C-alpha cells in the first residue's frame, strides 16, 4: 500500500522535491530496487497485454522475461542495479495482509462472475487483482540475477527499509520502488517508474527527502507521524483526516500525541488500541541487515548458464538470450572504461569559454594585421636617405 496520498501532497506543497528525468540521467549510479515490486509489474504487464508466457508445464515465465530484459536496459543506460527481496513481514503488518486476503477473495468471486458473463474487460481487471509474487517467483529471479552477474540482497524484513539502509550507508544512490514508504524509512532519494517498460514513455520521477522536509516545513520524526496519519501498512489511520488536514495538524502540533490531546472527538474517531507508537518505531528502527557488511559486486554474466536456465523448458529464444548476454558483457566493459576515464577528465567546452577563445583569436588577428599595416605604411612614408 505504501503511504496514502503522499505523492500528491509532496507535488502540491513541496514541488521542488520532485524532478523528472530520462533514465540516462542516472548513468553511473548504483540503485537499490524493490524486487517484489518489479516482479509484480512484470507479471501484470504480460497479463494486460493478453499474453501468457509459460513453461511447457504451464508455469509462468513473464517475471523472468521482465527481469532479464529490463535489467539489460538499466545496464545499457549505465545504471548498476541491486535487487532487494522482501523477508518476513513485521507482525504489525498482519492487519494489512488480512485486508489483502479479503480483497483477493472478493476479486476471485468477481472474476468468476465476469467469466460467466463473458465480460472481457472485467476478466482482465480482476485477473490483475489476483496476481501475487510467490516465493518460487523470487527464487527463480535470484537464480537469474546470479547468472546475469547482478547482485541481490535478501532483506530480513521489508525490502523498502533495506533499500533505504543501503542509501543511507552510501552503498547506492537511490531506492527504486513505487511504494512511497521508502521515504518514511529515510531513503534520501526515491525513484519511481525506473523499471517501467520503455513503451510506456514515463519519465523517471525522483523525490528528494531533504527537499520535501524543507518544503513541508517539518523534520524527519514529524514526517513519520505525518505518514502514519495519511495511512500506512502498519496501523489504521484516523477516519476523516485527509492529506491536507494531516499536514495542518503536524505543522500545528508537531506530533501525534499532541494532536490527540487537541483533536475534536466529535469530528474524528481515533481507532481503538491504535498502534501508532509501534508503527513509528518500525519506521525509525526497522529490521535491516547491516548495510556496511553488504558487499555489492557486478560480475561477468554466465552466457551458457543463462541459455540452459532460460531456454529448454522455459522456452526462451536462444538467439535472443545470447544477444542479451553479449549486451550484459558490453555494458560491464563500458562501465569499466567509465571508471578508467574518470581519472582523465576533460573540461567541457562551455559557451562562455568558446566565445572567449573566439574573441582572443580575433583580437590576436586584428593586432597582427595592425602591426603589418603599420610596418608596410611606415616603409612607404619614409624618404630615402
UniProtKB/Swiss-Prot annotation:
GO terms for molecular function: 5'-3' exonuclease activity; 5'-flap endonuclease activity; DNA binding; endonuclease activity; magnesium ion binding; manganese ion binding; RNA-DNA hybrid ribonuclease activity. Its main location: nucleus. It is found in: Nucleus, Nucleolus; Nucleus, Nucleoplasm; Mitochondrion. Phosphorylated. Phosphorylation upon DNA damage induces relocalization to the nuclear plasma. One of its GO terms (biological process) is DNA replication, removal of RNA primer. Residues 346-385 are annotated as: Disordered. One of its GO terms (cellular component) is nucleoplasm. Residues 336-344 are annotated as: Interaction with PCNA. PROSITE patterns: XPG_1, XPG_2. SMART domains: HhH2, XPGI, XPGN. Keywords: DNA damage, DNA repair, DNA replication, Endonuclease, Exonuclease, Hydrolase, Magnesium, Metal-binding, Mitochondrion, Nuclease, Nucleus, Phosphoprotein. Its EC number is 3.1.-.-. Mg(2+) 2 binds at residues 179, 181, 233. Transmembrane segments: none annotated. SUPFAM superfamilies: 5' to 3' exonuclease, C-terminal subdomain (SSF47807), PIN domain-like (SSF88723). Mg(2+) 1 binds at residues 34, 86, 158, 160. Residues 368-385 have a biased composition (Basic residues). Binds 2 magnesium ions per subunit. They probably participate in the reaction catalyzed by the enzyme. May bind an additional third magnesium ion after substrate binding. Interacts with PCNA. Three molecules of FEN1 bind to one PCNA trimer with each molecule binding to one PCNA monomer. PCNA stimulates the nuclease activity without altering cleavage specificity. Structure-specific nuclease with 5'-flap endonuclease and 5'-3' exonuclease activities involved in DNA replication and repair. During DNA replication, cleaves the 5'-overhanging flap structure that is generated by displacement synthesis when DNA polymerase encounters the 5'-end of a downstream Okazaki fragment. It enters the flap from the 5'-end and then tracks to cleave the flap base, leaving a nick for ligation. Also involved in the long patch base excision repair (LP-BER) pathway, by cleaving within the apurinic/apyrimidinic (AP) site-terminated flap. This is Flap endonuclease 1. The gene is Fen1.
